Amino acid sequence: MVPVGSPYFADYMLRLLIEMGRAEEAQSIIQERWGEFSRQGGTSVWEVWDMEQSLSHAWSCAPVPLAAHYFLGVHQRDSDLGENYWILPIAGSLRTVRGRVMTKYGAVHVEWKT
């Protein structure tokens, strides 16, 4: 696989991997790449993989919406104007997941174990 050039591009690649049934590979990349931020002393996500640019950059937050949509599995039903949601998580290598997603109707709490 071609190395991920930046955290920005990683969002597209991670989504594609998960949609192709390769969630464990996507989770491994998340643990390796985003874990490196904290191993290098970071307290936020950086614009690039090293500390040469902005040390707090929104485009580097790719794992956050991925976690809500794929790993928690919270999906809004397209036909219901956001009032109804369904839960269909993709576990990959995860064994326990707990979290919540905020909606205009309140929080959707999810917890599951394999």
List PLM regions with ranges.
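Solvent-exposed loop and edge beta-strand segments that line ligand/cofactor-binding
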Residues: 1-10, 52-59
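Non-catalytic C-terminal accessory modules of carbohydrate-active enzymes
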Residues: 19, 24-114
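Alpha-helical support elements that line or immediately flank enzyme active sites
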Residues: 7-21
